[in-house]
Amino acid sequence: MKIFLSISSLLCCLSFAQAQNTNITLNSDLNLNCKFEKVILKNPEHNFESFTKDQIKRKDINKLIIESKTPDVLNVKNLSEFFNKIDLEVKISNKDIFLIQAFDKERNYSESAVYTRKTGELIHEITTNIKQEEKEKDISFYSCKNNNKDT
């Protein structure tokens, strides 16, 4: 009986945790072209220094696909190789934003992204060396336009 209660409690906790990390309230199908604007770097050489597109070379994102379907589907394609091949831990999509986050198996690397529908701004953050005292961050900012005029 104790084992049954323990397993039931664990499943309830996992379900609650999953519900907190997934909140899809809007179906959408976005096809975005995003122009790189600036990056903020935190690493041994730079302490949260900002660089514009004129100061550092970064690629634009062509054909960023965001598909969401209630209650729990959120797919993002072409943002990064990491996002293309991993399951998302955080999936939020509503009338204002979409937010995603994922970690590698060792939980020492993560990527997250926030897209604001109203402004078209996309922020893509990469964090490395999470388990170490000196984490490194690469935070890129993009200006996006939706190619699907009807969404």
Protein language model regions, located:
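Classical Sec-dependent N-terminal signal peptides that target proteins to the secretory pathway
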Residues: 1-22
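Secreted/extracellular small peptides and ectodomain modules produced from precursors
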Residues: 10-11, 32, 142
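Short, hydrophobic/aromatic-rich segments at coil-to-beta transitions
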Residues: 24-33, 73-74, 93-101, 120-123
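Short, solvent-exposed loop/hinge segments that bridge or flank secondary-structure elements
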Residues: 29-74, 109-115
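Short, surface-exposed coil-to-beta transition loops
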Residues: 60, 85-86, 106-112, 123, ...
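Contiguous, well-ordered beta-strand patches that form the walls/edges
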Residues: 69-115
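Extended soluble regions of mature proteins
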Residues: 113-128
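Edge beta-strand at a domain terminus
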Residues: 126-151
